[in-house]
């Protein structure tokens, strides 16, 4: 009985009180100071952090953890967890849970940070009304439903790996500022009343066909890559700085209201004509690769740093006014025969394998290099087809390196040194 045990002077570290042998082992090792096989009131009070590694056990029970009313942080690594009840751990602030399966979970409403890496969680992650919640992290695994409606959550994000999640419910989360998930199998998203959102990233967003962001007037960054969305309105999102609709079904967009846009990506979409922006001189990154676009007008794109026009239908590319360019990708752009980058002194990467380029002018680009962390240079690799003349500067330190690399790859390159 919980109330009897909680009011007693001590709790025996037995299988009856703590069915998990891994939990008993941790308690004996770290908290049974006098090694009498029991936890005194003082020892129980001192249990503020608990780390239970049960990966070698087939299943684990957390029965007994409810006694630790002073517990602040719990790290649990397990295989099969049938049920977790942390509702009585009122002071619990941080939960880190990594498991193969979790079938049922009940949490303390005073949680601040949670991290889940669960391969299979068929139950609902229920954070409704959690007024102290700040961050939810989901890592590699399959989850059914996340419901954080009415909570104080500020950030919902993934860890290092994509997740599978069917439902996201976060209505009326007044403090929510960022939802950043690389998520598959998504069927439903409800963010109504969450109007303070600044970042919304739903990459690989499964079966989602519609998304209404009209009331998210503070939105700065929006990504809906890999969705089935065919139309998307951002007319009300005047603070938008980054938009990524790559790998979606979208064919056109009205961006006339988005004067603060800096990053625009629409790779592998049905867009067949360059999307018009109201303030082209603010654009720093443009990715229109893998589309049927046949022409690009970049005369006013004076701040452009990164351009990806790989596998497009363009026949010419004028970037004379784009003096800030750092990377240019035109890989597989077979109809492009000439590329003049003589004005680009800040250039580091030019990726043009399998393109139709016969002449490439990089005479003022002394920074092209793939021997540091700043870029991949020309990205000469076996398997690509390159046959062209490259005009380079005599002071370019990497010339011999790339000449040798081109020979090793079997490329037919004529080097003109100026």
Predicted regions and their residues:
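N-terminal capping/linker segments that flank leucine-rich repeat
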Residues: 1-75, 90, 126-131, 140, ...
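Conserved hydrophobic position(s) of the canonical leucine-rich repeat
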Residues: 47, 71, 81, 92, ...
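Conserved hydrophobic beta-strand positions in leucine-rich repeat
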Residues: 50-53, 74-76, 95-97, 114-116, ...
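Feature marks extracellular polysaccharide-active and adherence modules
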Residues: 53, 77, 87, 98, ...
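Canonical leucine-rich repeat
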Residues: 60-65, 84-86, 105, 125, ...
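Ankyrin-repeat and related helical/solenoid repeat scaffolds used for protein-protein interactions
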Residues: 310, 321-393
């Amino acid at each position: 009985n919980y109330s009897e045990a909680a009011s007693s002077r001590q709790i025996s570290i037995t299988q009856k009180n703590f069915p998990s042998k891994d939990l008993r082992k941790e308690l004996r090792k770290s908290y049974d100071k006098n090694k009498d096989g029991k936890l005194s009131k003082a020892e129980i009070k001192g249990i503020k952090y608990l780390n239970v590694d049960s990966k070698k056990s087939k299943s684990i029970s957390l029965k007994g953890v409810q006694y630790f009313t002073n517990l602040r942080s719990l790290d649990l690594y397990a295989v099969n967890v049938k049920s977790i009840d942390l509702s009585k751990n009122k002071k619990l602030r941080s939960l880190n849970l990594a498991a193969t399966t979790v079938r049922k979970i009940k949490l303390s409403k005073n949680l601040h940070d949670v991290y889940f890496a669960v391969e299979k969680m068929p139950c609902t992650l229920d954070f409704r009304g959690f007024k102290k919640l700040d961050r939810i992290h989901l890592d590699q695994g399959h989850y059914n439903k996340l419901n954080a409606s009415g909570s104080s959550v500020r950030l919902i994000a993934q860890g290092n790996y994509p997740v599978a999640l069917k439902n996201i419910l976060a209505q009326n989360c007044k403090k929510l500022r960022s939802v950043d998930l690389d998520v598959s199998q998504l069927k439903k998203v409800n963010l109504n009343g969450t109007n303070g959102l600044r970042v919304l990233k739903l990459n690989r967003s499964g079966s989602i066909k519609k998304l209404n962001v009209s009331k998210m007037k503070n939105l700065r960054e929006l990504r809906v890559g890999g969705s089935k969305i065919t139309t998307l309105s951002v007319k009300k999102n005047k603070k938008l700085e980054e938009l990524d609709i790559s790998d979606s079904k979208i064919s056109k967009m009205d961006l006339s209201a988005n004067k603060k846009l800096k990053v625009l990506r629409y790779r592998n979409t049905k867009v067949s004509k360059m999307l018009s922006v109201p303030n082209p001189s603010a654009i720093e990154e443009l990715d229109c690769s893998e589309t049927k676009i046949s022409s690009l007008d970049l005369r006013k794109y004076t701040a452009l740093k990164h351009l990806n026009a790989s596998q497009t239908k363009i026949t010419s590319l004028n970037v004379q006014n784009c003096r800030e360019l750092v990377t240019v990708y035109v890989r597989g752009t077979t109809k492009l025969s000439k590329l003049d980058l003589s004005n680009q002194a800040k250039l580091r990467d030019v990726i043009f394998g399998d393109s139709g380029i016969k002449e490439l002018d990089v005479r003022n680009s002394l920074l092209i290099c793939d021997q540091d962390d700043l870029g991949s240079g020309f990205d000469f690799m076996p398997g690509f087809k390159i046959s062209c003349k490259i005009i380079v500067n005599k002071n370019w330190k990497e010339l011999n390196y790339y000449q040798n690399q081109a020979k090793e790859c079997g490329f037919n390159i004529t080097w003109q040194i100026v």
